[in-house]
C-alpha cells in the first residue's frame, strides 16, 4: 500500500467512526481492508461480503468520496471483494447447484412473507445478541450446512423477527430462486386447520416440505396440547426438510427445554443445531439502536436526548420504537425541529399516561433531603466512601433521582460524582427490590419524598 493509499484508508476509517454507531463500526468496518486503488477505484476486502457490501454501499459511499477528494483530489469509487474469494465462490457454486436441482421440480412459486426492510445491515449488534447475529449470518451464508436448526430465543421486542427476516432476505439475494418462507407458528396452525377443513392436506405438504428455508416465528404457540395433529404435521415437515439438508430457523420466547407442552421428540430436534439466547440491550446498545432508528425521522436528536431515552426504556427495542412514534406526534404538534429532553419527556408521560410533572426537582435537592434524613452530607453522598450508612443514603438518592426526575441515567451518574450509568441502574434496582420487601424502608422513602415535593 502506498503512502497516499494509507492516508486515504485512515481517513475512511476516521470518517466512518464519526458517522455510524460504534456497534456498526465494529461489525461492518473494523475487519475491512483496502487492497489497492487502481484507476480511481478503491478495492476493499470484506468478510460476509453479500451482507456487508450492502451496508457499505448504503451508508459509506459519501465517506469514500470525501476521503478521495481530500487525499487525491479525485472522485474515488469502490469495488468490494471477498477476503476469501475461493471459499466464497466454492460455497456459492455448491449452494447454487443444490438450489438448481431442487428448482427443476414442478413446484409452484410461493410468497416468502419477508419484510425487506429487515436486514443484517440495519440490525444493531451488542454483547447481548452477538452470538445470535453471528449464527444467523453463518446460516444465511450456507443454508442447511451449519446450525440446523438455528433456535433463537429471548423476550419480546429484542430482534428475533428482524433476524429471521434478515436471514431470508440475504438467502434470496444470493439465490433469487430459493424457496423461502417466513411464517408465525400461529399462522402455521391456522393453515393446518384450514387445509384439514378443505380436505387439502397434500397442498399443505407440498408447500412446506419443498422449501429451501423455513423461518418459523414464536414456535411456543405450537406448544398447546389442544391442537391435535398440528404438532404431528410440523414434526413430519421438520423431518422432511432436515433430511434433505434444508435450513430451518425457529424463534421462541423461551429455551427449547422450557417448551413443556411440546412433544419431547420436537424439543429434542430443536436442540440438534444451535440454541442461542438474546437478552435485553444494555445502555450502550440502546443508544446505538436509537442512533440508528432516529435516521427514519426528520428531526435533530441531541446526544443528551438520545441518552435520556435510552435510560427510560431498558427492556426491549419495541418500546424504544413506540416512544419515537409518540415523540414524532408531539414534535409535529409543537412544530419542533429539534427533539429536546423536555419534548421527549412530555411524549413519554403521554405514552405512560403519567400526566404532567408540575415541578422540576433538582437532583441536588434530593441529595440534600436524603442527606438530612440519614445524617450524611451531600459531599459524602457524591464521594467514594463506602460505609454502610453512606452507601444506603447514596443509593436511596439515586433511586429518588430516577423516580422523581426526567434525567437520564448518565446525567444522574454525573451528579453523583461522575459515576457510570450502570452504577445508577444497579442502585435503583436494589432499592426498588428492597422497598418491595422492607416496609420500614418504604416509609422512610415516602417521608423523604414528602420533604422534597
Swiss-Prot record:
Start and end residues of each stretch annotated as Domain IV, binds dsDNA: 332-453
Record region (Domain III, AAA+ region): 113-331
Localization: Cytoplasm
Gene Ontology molecular function: any one: ATP binding
This protein's UniProt keywords: ATP-binding, Cytoplasm, DNA replication, DNA-binding, Lipid-binding, Nucleotide-binding
Region listing for Domain II, in residue ranges: 78-112
Gene3D superfamilies: 1.10.1750.10, 1.10.8.60, P-loop containing nucleotide triphosphate hydrolases
Record InterPro entries: AAA+_ATPase, Chromosome_initiator_DnaA, Chromosome_initiator_DnaA-like, Chromosome_initiator_DnaA_CS, DnaA_C, DnaA_dom, P-loop_NTPase, Trp_repressor/repl_initiator
GO biological process, one term: regulation of DNA replication
GO CC field: cytoplasm; plasma membrane
Listed Pfam families: Bac_DnaA, Bac_DnaA_C
Region (Domain I, interacts with DnaA modulators): 1-78
Binding locations of ATP: 157, 159-161
Domain of life: Bacteria
Function as written in the Swiss-Prot or TrEMBL entry: Plays an essential role in the initiation and regulation of chromosomal replication. ATP-DnaA binds to the origin of replication (oriC) to initiate formation of the DNA replication initiation complex once per cell cycle. Binds the DnaA box (a 9 base pair repeat at the origin) and separates the double-stranded (ds)DNA. Forms a right-handed helical filament on oriC DNA; dsDNA binds to the exterior of the filament while single-stranded (ss)DNA is stabiized in the filament's interior.
Domain remark text: Domain I is involved in oligomerization and binding regulators, domain II is flexibile and of varying length in different bacteria, domain III forms the AAA+ region, while domain IV binds dsDNA.
Family: Belongs to the DnaA family.
Subunit record text: Oligomerizes as a right-handed, spiral filament on DNA at oriC.
Protein name: Chromosomal replication initiator protein DnaA
Lineage of origin: Bacteria, Bacillati, Bacillota, Bacilli, Lactobacillales
Amino acid at each position: 500500500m502506498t503512502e497516499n493509499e494509507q492516508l486515504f484508508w485512515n481517513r475512511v476509517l476516521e470518517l466512518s467512526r464519526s458517522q455510524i454507531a460504534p456497534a456498526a463500526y465494529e461489525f461492518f468496518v473494523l475487519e475491512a481492508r483496502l487492497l489497492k486503488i487502481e484507476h480511481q477505484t478503491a478495492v476493499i476486502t470484506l468478510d460476509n461480503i453479500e451482507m456487508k457490501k450492502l451496508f457499505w454501499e448504503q451508508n459509506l459511499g459519501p465517506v469514500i468520496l470525501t476521503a478521495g477528494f481530500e487525499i487525491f483530489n479525485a472522485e474515488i469509487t469502490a469495488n468490494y471483494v471477498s477476503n476469501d474469494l475461493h471459499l466464497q465462490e466454492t460455497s456459492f457454486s455448491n449452494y447454487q447447484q443444490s438450489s438448481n436441482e431442487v428448482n427443476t421440480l414442478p413446484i409452484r412459486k410461493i410468497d416468502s412473507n419477508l419484510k425487506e426492510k429487515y436486514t443484517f445491515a440495519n440490525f444493531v449488534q451488542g454483547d447481548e445478541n452477538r452470538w445470535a447475529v453471528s449464527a444467523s449470518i453463518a446460516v444465511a451464508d450456507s443454508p442447511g450446512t451449519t446450525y440446523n436448526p438455528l433456535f433463537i430465543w429471548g423476550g419480546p421486542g429484542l430482534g428475533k423477527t428482524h433476524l429471521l427476516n434478515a436471514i431470508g432476505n440475504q438467502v434470496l439475494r444470493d439465490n433469487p430462486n430459493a424457496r423461502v418462507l417466513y411464517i408465525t407458528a400461529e399462522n402455521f396452525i391456522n393453515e393446518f386447520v384450514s387445509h384439514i377443513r378443505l380436505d387439502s392436506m397434500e397442498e399443505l405438504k407440498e408447500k412446506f416440505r419443498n422449501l429451501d428455508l423455513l423461518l418459523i416465528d414464536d414456535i411456543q404457540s405450537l406448544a398447546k396440547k389442544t391442537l391435535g395433529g398440528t404438532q404431528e404435521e410440523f414434526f413430519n415437515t421438520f423431518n422432511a426438510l432436515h433430511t434433505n439438508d434444508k435450513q430451518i430457523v425457529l424463534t421462541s420466547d423461551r429455551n427449547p427445554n422450557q417448551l413443556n407442552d411440546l412433544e419431547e421428540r420436537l424439543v429434542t430436534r430443536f436442540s440438534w443445531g444451535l440454541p442461542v439466547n438474546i437478552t435485553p440491550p444494555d445502555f450502550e446498545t440502546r443508544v446505538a439502536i436509537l442512533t440508528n432508528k432516529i435516521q427514519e425521522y426528520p428531526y435533530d436528536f441531541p446526544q443528551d436526548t438520545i441518552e435520556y431515552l435510552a435510560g427510560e426504556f431498558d427492556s426491549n427495542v419495541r418500546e424504544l420504537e413506540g416512544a419515537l412514534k409518540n415523540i414524532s406526534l408531539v414534535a409535529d404538534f409543537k412544530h419542533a425541529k429539534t427533539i429536546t429532553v423536555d419534548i421527549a419527556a412530555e411524549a413519554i408521560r403521554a405514552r405512560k399516561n403519567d400526566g404532567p410533572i408540575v415541578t422540576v426537582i433538582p437532583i441536588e435537592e434530593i441529595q440534600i433531603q436524603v442527606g438530612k434524613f440519614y445524617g450524611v452530607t451531600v459531599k459524602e453522598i457524591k464521594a467514594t466512601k463506602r460505609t454502610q450508612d453512606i452507601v444506603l443514603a447514596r443509593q436511596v438518592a439515586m433511586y429518588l433521582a430516577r423516580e422523581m426526575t426526567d434525567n437520564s441515567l448518565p446525567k444522574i451518574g454525573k451528579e453523583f460524582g461522575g459515576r457510570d450509568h450502570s452504577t445508577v441502574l444497579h442502585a435503583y434496582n436494589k432499592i426498588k427490590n428492597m422497598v418491595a420487601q422492607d416496609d420500614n424502608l418504604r416509609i422512610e422513602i415516602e417521608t423523604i419524598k414528602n420533604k422534597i415535593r
